[in-house]
């Protein structure tokens, strides 16, 4: 129940990858025929991915994952456009790959506006317009939030960016396999994606860069990826990611409809069968696989540990920050107190999740919640006084 953290590799994806581990293991940058077969596989993958998002093949750049893609997009755009301006607009609920990159740039002379969100995690379009300055060079807003699932008004943001001639980047790591994305209709100039979020391999991602966007390299060295991303291609990873992307988009409508039905069933059971819970994130403009609740009078980490003992995987936020004792920056940004933020639990399903599995998980959450609350003096006091 933690598919937002990562997903299982599909068997069809693994089969597609296998030849490039031990049979056709050549370096695609070499000139001999053996290597050119590997290069052809990389280029076929590039063509496939481009077709899924309405892009040209030469606008797809393979990376090591979402964090690298985010870093590349933000840093390279800032460097390339520093003569034009030094102002970047983003939001307070972005992934840390964006936020920490922006903080790095602030230490190096750039100015960053961190937009507030409402209680559902939604960006205010008017606030974006009001934040634009003559020196604004980049807007970076995630397509959908990784913790609370809220889907942002990306098409409207893209229209604003195009109107003001500002580059628009979106982190679509969570959205890519669940929402049809057309980079042209949404006026997206750069987009980050990571393969392991949609049943592809870890260590493979891509950055879409519109041809009109002239940014430099993040990693320097060889001439791979048209001299914009040095390093030997991860051929099995690239091939596997493309196969996973094709499978995800082939069955997207069916899978999404099923996930929404199961998600809403999951949410309904939690809300109807456990007292003092609060759904985090937008109720309808939400990723089809995301469930995030505050369960009051229950410490989130304790809940997760006890669920883990029952073989149930869940999280209290992003897997990238799971070792931190600080409250989720996303939950505090939507107005939760530190105390309430620490009562949160994120569950995320996949197209393989069944109603029977959800029923098992809900029953375990109910048992664990009852047990933890029985040890909580705050819960006892609240119930007695109300």
Per-segment meaning from a language model:
Residues 1-386:
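Pyridoxal 5′-phosphate
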């Amino acid at each position: 129940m933690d598919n937002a953290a990562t997903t299982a590799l599909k068997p069809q994806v693994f089969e597609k990858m296998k030849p490039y581990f031990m049979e056709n293991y050549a370096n695609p940058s070499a000139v001999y025929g053996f290597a050119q077969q590997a290069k052809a596989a990389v280029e076929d993958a590039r063509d496939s991915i481009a077709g899924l998002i309405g892009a040209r093949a030469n606008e797809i750049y393979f990376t090591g994952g979402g964090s690298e893609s985010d870093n590349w997009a933000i840093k390279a755009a800032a460097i390339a456009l520093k003569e034009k301006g030094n102002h970047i607009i983003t939001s307070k609920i972005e992934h840390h790959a964006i936020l920490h990159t922006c903080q790095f740039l602030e230490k190096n002379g750039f100015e960053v506006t961190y937009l507030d969100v409402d209680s559902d995690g939604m960006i205010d379009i008017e606030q974006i317009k009001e934040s634009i300055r003559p020196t604004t060079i980049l807007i970076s807003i995630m397509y959908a939030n990784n913790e609370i699932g809220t889907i942002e008004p990306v098409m409207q943001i893209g229209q604003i960016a195009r109107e003001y001639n500002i580059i628009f980047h979106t982190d679509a790591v969570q959205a890519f396999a669940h929402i049809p994305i057309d980079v042209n209709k949404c006026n997206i100039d750069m987009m980050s994606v990571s393969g392991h979020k949609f049943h592809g391999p870890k260590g493979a991602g891509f950055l879409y860069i519109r041809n009109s966007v002239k940014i430099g390299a993040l990693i320097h060295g060889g001439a791979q990826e048209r001299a914009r991303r040095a390093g030997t291609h991860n051929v099995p990873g690239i091939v596997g990611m493309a196969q996973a992307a094709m499978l995800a988009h082939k069955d997207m409508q069916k899978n999404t409809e099923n996930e929404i039905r199961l998600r809403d069933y999951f949410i309904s059971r939690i809300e109807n069968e456990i007292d003092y819970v609060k759904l985090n994130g937008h109720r309808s403009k939400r990723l089809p696989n995301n469930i995030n609740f505050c369960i009051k009078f229950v410490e989130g980490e304790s809940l997760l540990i006890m669920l883990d003992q029952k073989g149930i995987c869940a999280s209290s936020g992003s897997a990238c920050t799971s070792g931190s004792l600080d409250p989720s920056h996303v939950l505090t940004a939507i107005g939760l107190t530190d105390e309430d933020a620490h009562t949160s639990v994120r569950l995320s399903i996949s197209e393989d999740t069944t109603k029977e599995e959800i029923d098992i998980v809900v029953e375990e959450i109910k048992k664990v919640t009852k047990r933890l609350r029985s040890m909580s003096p705050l819960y006892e006091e609240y119930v007695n006084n109300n």
